[in-house]
């Protein structure tokens, strides 16, 4: 992606954002750049806003929420659940996502963990915290990224086009349902929440009182049905390498 396209896509999110959101985002980007002098932080500085850069607001069809980036080397790339194509060992949650993709759509397991082709089709792959210290999960959860990511999720609830939220895990479910309620969005406005347990090996096969198990939930075909029923083109989920 060239720099002009990247800036233009990010501007679809931040151009009209309230000043406190823009100020906080700029402050955090500067702070993270400063902290890199004394600690290893993921993802790379230029990748922090990749979710917004690859999926402009007017193209969003599906939102997949994560919590924070992978905290091991050569994994985080600014898109939730995604790893670079050069990463040969897939994280366990992504392996389960691919198993469910195969079961749902009958496609082969993708050879790469790079989900950029999904993002380029309108799948917003957003972590609610955008950075993490190496080997320290949730270490940046209280830095203030929620000012930006809460705003982005609220924007998704208010977009004119149909949007399907794939809420994997209790955290994502509560986040999405809370934002839908707060913005008055829902089925009548073309906004849908498909919730299940998280694809982590600890929960992927375990239904709870509130959530069906991720494995067997068939989220990809379900999202496409909702998109098509409301006049939007489906996502080509099997486009990965």
Positions of PLM-derived features:
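A short acidic-Thr-Gly-centered motif at the start of a beta-strand
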Residues: 49-58, 156-158, 177
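A general structural motif
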Residues: 59-60, 160-162, 190
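Glycine-rich anion-binding loop/nest that anchors nucleotide
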Residues: 64, 148, 156-172
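Short, conserved, surface-exposed binding loops centered on an aromatic residue
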Residues: 114-119, 157
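C-terminal capping/extension of enzyme domains
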Residues: 1-27, 32-37, 100-105, 130-157, ...
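Short, well-ordered beta-to-alpha junction loops that form the rim of enzyme active sites
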Residues: 45, 67, 128, 167-171
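Adenosine ribonucleotide-centric catalytic and binding domains
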Residues: 55-110
């Amino acid at each position: 992606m060239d720099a002009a396209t990247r800036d233009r896509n990010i501007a679809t999110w931040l151009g009209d954002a309230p000043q406190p959101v823009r100020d906080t985002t700029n402050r955090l980007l500067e702070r993270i750049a400063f902290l890199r002098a004394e600690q290893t932080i993921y993802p790379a500085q230029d990748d922090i806003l990749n979710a917004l850069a690859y999926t402009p607001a007017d193209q969003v069809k599906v939102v997949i929420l994560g919590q924070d980036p992978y905290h091991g080397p050569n994994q985080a790339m600014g898109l939730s659940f995604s790893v670079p194509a050069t990463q040969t060992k897939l994280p366990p949650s992504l392996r389960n996502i691919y198993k469910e993709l195969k079961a749902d759509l009958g496609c082969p397991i993708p050879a790469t963990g790079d989900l950029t082709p999904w993002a380029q089709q309108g799948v917003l792959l957003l972590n609610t915290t955008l950075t993490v210290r190496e080997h320290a999960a949730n270490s940046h959860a209280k830095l203030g990224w929620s000012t930006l990511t809460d705003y982005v999720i609220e924007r998704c609830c208010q977009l004119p086009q149909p949007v399907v939220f794939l809420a994997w895990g209790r955290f994502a479910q509560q986040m999405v349902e809370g934002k839908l309620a707060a913005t008055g969005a829902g089925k009548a406005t073309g906004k849908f929440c498909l919730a299940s347990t998280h694809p982590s090996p600890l929960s992927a096969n375990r239904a709870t009182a509130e959530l069906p198990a991720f494995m067997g939930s068939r989220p990809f075909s379900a999202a496409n049905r909702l998109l098509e029923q409301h006049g939007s083109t489906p996502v080509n989920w099997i486009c990965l390498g």
